Amino acid sequence: MPPPIQGYGFGESVDLRSFLYDRLVATRIRYMGNKHDVAPVVAELVRRRRGDRPFLDVFCGLCSVGGAVARTGRRVVGNDVQSFASLVARCLIATVELPPSPEEFKRALRCSHLYNERRLLERFGGDVAREACILADADGDAYRRAYASWRHAANDESVAAEIDEITRGGNRRPYRLATLTFAWGYFGLRQAIAIDSMRFAIDRARETGRLTPAGADWALVALLQAASCASASPGHFAQYLRPTSDEGFVRILRQRRRDIWAQFLHEAGELEPYGDPEWRRGNSVMRSDALKIWDDLDGFSSQDWIVYADPPYSKDHYSRYYHVLETLTRYDYPAAAGMGRYRPDRFATPFSLKTCVEAAMNELCCAIAERGYTFILSYPSNGLLNADCGVDPGELLREHFGRVDLRMRRPTSHSTLGARHGSARNSVDELLWVAC
């Protein structure tokens, strides 16, 4: 176990390990925005505030901060604009029901899974057999030919038209979104068929009562975890690995050989929420733009909130890195475009635009300050606001709040999001302010 984390302006050494769970993360979904290092510091800052004040995380992501705050017993509300993130947050911090066991999932899902799979194999059986031979022989040249010839929603008008027809109310069965959009890209064809069949089984189990609504949500989280583990991509979903080199093909081959059903059952056995049932019963999750949440929050409660924000800090729009997870969660058959097979309606945040980030941060601060809430802001030293625009976040906070304290400056490293050239990580300082 690491040594106690010292200082951070608390006035004495504080052992922040009590806020960390035995597991490093509560979910294995690929996500680069987790704040595992910052989370215990935020939890200690929250603990020191008046005991009945609830905690709001306006960019909650996969809830590493909300999970740390669980140890304080504070009520937590998480918010995220992405559907997949709000689903995970709901399961981890706001669902009383524990996840079903792998055996319970088997009983609830297997028959429907096999039904959808059989329907898809009637159409794609020959293609699946060819893929299996290529993978068994580890034939890189054959793989490259098959990859180049595969037709999908982003490169074929007839497949795109089929997607559009489904969106307009056409026959959705058998489920085939991943097969038509992501096969021979992020996933193998057999894997995409399995993902679609798992999603069909989850929806059927929800409809028929074989799984409770919460149980079906847990199943979907396990499926997202299985998809994350099986995806042939560099730690995110902005792009997938292409077989342009022998090394790349070896990496793809390793991922293609993962069995989605087996991976799903493994992930199901790893699911575990934060906190105890009574704590989770008092929590809730919202799905909204962080700049538009405030009117809803005003009607939600009149309490004096402690608000935490970890806004996007780079020019990269994060929705691009998670579009596959978003599509598998919403399962709405969007159009697909480009090499990444992106959905066209990906969320774009002003926090990632150089011309808009200062105004967005001012708008966020104004909404919090005018309501008299305490604001905890996390931002790196190389963020778009300070490094590119020359605006000191601390000074910006002082324009809105009477007291602003820098409570943490900690060296860390950030992923370069799969950049092809240079270091995979950048050394930066993680900064944390408290404003009230």
Report the location of each language-model feature.
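Conserved SAM-binding motif I beta-strand of class I
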Residues: V76-D80
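Conserved Class I SAM-dependent methyltransferase catalytic core
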Residues: F351-D405
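SAM-dependent methyltransferase catalytic-core segment centered on the flexible catalytic loop
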Residues: S314-R371
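SAM-dependent nucleic-acid methyltransferase catalytic core
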Residues: R17-F19, A39, E44, S64, ...
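S-adenosyl-L-methionine
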Residues: P2-L56, S64-R71, S86-V88
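Class I S-adenosyl-L-methionine
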Residues: G394-C436
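Conserved phosphoryl-transfer catalytic core
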Residues: C91-P174, T181
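Conserved glycine-centered beta->alpha loop in an early N-terminal alpha/beta scaffold
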Residues: F59
